Amino acid sequence: MGNCLYPVADDNSTKLAIKEDLLIDFPEDYYPDYNETDVEAAAPCHSCSLLNYSSLPFFILVSILGILASGTILYALLRPLFRWQLYQDRSTLVQLAVGSALFSIVVPILARGLSGALITSLCHLAHLVAYGSAFAQALLIGYHACLGPQLGAGQVPGLRLGVTVGLWGVAALLSLPVVLGSDTSQGLCTVTFSGEWETLRYIHAAACFAIFVLLPLGLLGTKGLKTVLGRAPCPWVDVLWVWFIFWWPQGMTLGLDSLVRSKAIVVSTCPAQQALDMLLDVAEALAILHCVATPLLLAWVCYQATHTSPPSLPLPTTQTSHLDTLGSKS
């Protein structure tokens, strides 16, 4: 088979060599005056994928490290000792660790180099778990930034279960386009969006752009606006926001690729198309690495929470007025 740089010669190359020997006797002025620029422009543009068959060790290594790291942080979060030491919303941190572990488990199925007779339903399930867990983690981080300390203090009883079911349900719905667009081609589990599923490509790109790009930008904008206006500290900034660094390029590149495919942006040169394909592979590799980084971020959150005092929350208006009344009486 060869590779992108050094293709292996086949029978056709021998035939071409014979034709060249036969045509060498013709005079140079026999050939018409072709424009070499037009010939190069008409040639097909071929990109060498970074995540090809040789990337299988990368997928397996990331999967093993992700499973070990996620299992370790889950064990730490579920220990009874943490129930009184951890001031953060522990259930949200546990869900983030579970999402990272689920993603780590299905990473080898998504590997380009893992060939074999994969059944289509397993491929669909792998993409559902991978993107469903990624969407859920993004929504959980946004939810934790807005309501985490309040829920940890027990000020919103009965809301935690409903929010959990709702967030994971929305994440599953957002992952349906990529699930339906995935297929087993030549024994590999890939996303093709072929045939009648072509429209789902743009829906999937829009979902990734909204969750992985617009959501963190919205959190940053809200935080900056409230800081300038001197309002409440929500959303709370913590190290979990680093998670979006791993998925933000994925949302951007998928959105750009959709614009190119829909002809909204015209890529007229082959190097530009090759650069876009390379960016897509780099963004995918960076997104895969999040399953190793997420447990480390959770470990840092736990370390900070167990070595600092619980966050101070603003008192409700009724409670503040009641305390003022007691102070005036005394």
Swiss-Prot record:
Glycosylation sites: 12, 35, 52
Cytoplasmic membrane side: 79-89, 148-160, 223-238, 303-330
GO molecular function: C-C chemokine binding; G protein-coupled receptor activity
CDD domains, per database record: 7tmA_ACKR1_DARC (cd15010)
Cited InterPro entries: Duffy_chemokine_rcpt
Location relative to the cell: Early endosome; Recycling endosome; Membrane
Gene3D superfamilies per UniProt: Rhodopsin 7-helix transmembrane proteins (1.20.1070.10)
Disulfide bridge map: 45-270, 123-189
Transmembrane segments: 58-78, 90-110, 124-147, 161-181, 202-222, 239-259, 282-302
Any one GO cellular component localisation term in the record: recycling endosome
Residues in the Extracellular compartment per record: 1-57, 111-123, 182-201, 260-281
Membrane topology term: Multi-pass membrane protein
Glycoprotein is among the record's keywords: yes
Keywords linked to the UniProt accession: Disulfide bond, Endosome, G-protein coupled receptor, Glycoprotein, Membrane, Receptor, Transducer, Transmembrane, Transmembrane helix
Cleaved signal peptide residues: none
Domain of life of the source: Eukaryota
BP terms from Gene Ontology: chemokine-mediated signaling pathway; inflammatory response; regulation of chemokine production
Function description: Atypical chemokine receptor that controls chemokine levels and localization via high-affinity chemokine binding that is uncoupled from classic ligand-driven signal transduction cascades, resulting instead in chemokine sequestration, degradation, or transcytosis. Also known as interceptor (internalizing receptor) or chemokine-scavenging receptor or chemokine decoy receptor. Has a promiscuous chemokine-binding profile, interacting with inflammatory chemokines of both the CXC and the CC subfamilies but not with homeostatic chemokines.
Family, per entry: Belongs to the G-protein coupled receptor 1 family. Atypical chemokine receptor subfamily.
Name listed for the protein in its UniProt record: Atypical chemokine receptor 1
Taxonomic lineage of the native organism: Eukaryota, Metazoa, Chordata, Craniata, Vertebrata
